[in-house]
Each structure stands twice: as structure tokens, then as C-alpha cells.
């Protein structure tokens, strides 16, 4: 896969920030880069960064934003935790090593006209066992890397109050969870969805 050089440089620079768990992280990245759709998966089926490598670009954007927010609001969180949760928060969107979660939608233009509305470029792979994105993220990552409670909470609850299941953590979010949620939303709704230019 030919990744945009700027994206690759940003990605590689962020990976170097993981130092205390460098070996675990390197093994995880090797697995993701060589056995999964991590480098090619879209970030969504029809919205932000709905294109090849969109998930990787989104994860890099979130990591960079999270580091900036952390610097300003809560410098006690280390670089390593920021990069790890940013890279893993939507990891479940890759699906499984042998099956992607998001598949190209091969609906013909004629069929699309029959629907009377635009057809999403990607569709969900219904052959995979249903797991929420955060649960699949942990399922994929935990065999390779140990996570702190705060990192686990951040990954599981990064969608904040947008998800009904997350109500149980309301008012009990760690600073890392709050910052990841904001970095994720900022990028998905403002930067990547084009609102910056509206």
C-alpha cells in the first residue's frame, strides 16, 4: 500500500513516543500493519474519512490533537498513553485479521438510483460476530499490550455521552477519557468532516 508520505511521517513520529512499552507496542503494530486492515480501513462507512486509510489518518489526527490538549489542560498524562489510546480507540473498525469490518459497497449506479438517496461507499460486514467498536478494539489489542485502567476506560468510553451505553460512566470519566473524547469529536466533526472550511 502506498501511504501518503506526510501521513506516514506523522504516524512514525507518533509511534516513537511509546517508550516504556516499546516492545509490546512494536509487536502490536507489527500485527496490525501486516495481518489486518489497519493501514487501509476507512474511518467510517459514509461520513468522516470514508476512504482508504481513513482510519489511520483519523487515529493520527486524534493522537496529535490529544497531545496538544494534554499539553494545555492536563500535562500529567504521558505521551505514551495519549498515543496508545488514540491509536486504539477505533481499532475495532478494522474487523478481524481475516475479515474487514467495512467492505466496499458495490452497488451499481442504476441500483443506487432505485434507492432514491446516495449509497454509502462502504457497508458493514455482516459475517463478523457483532462486537461494539471499543470491545473489538480491546479484543484485538490486549493479547499484545497491557493497558492501564485509565487507558481502558478511555478506549471503551471515548464516544462520551453520544452512546447510550456510556451513561454509566457519566461524571466518572478520567481526564484521559475526557481528552480523548474531545480530540476524537473535534477531528471527526470539525477537521475531517470539513466543518473547518464552512
What are these regions (language model features)?
Residues 4, 18-22, 56, 145, ...:
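Generic detection of long, well-ordered alpha-helical segments
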Residues 1-41:
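Non-catalytic interface/linker regions that flank or bridge core catalytic/transmembrane domains
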Residues 43-51, 57, 69-196:
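Divalent metal-dependent catalytic cores for phosphoryl transfer on phosphate-bearing substrates
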Residues 32-35, 66-69, 158:
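Alpha-helix boundary/capping residues
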Residues 1, 197-198:
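C-terminal end-of-chain micro-motif
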Residues 10-14, 65, 136-140:
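A general alpha-helix detector
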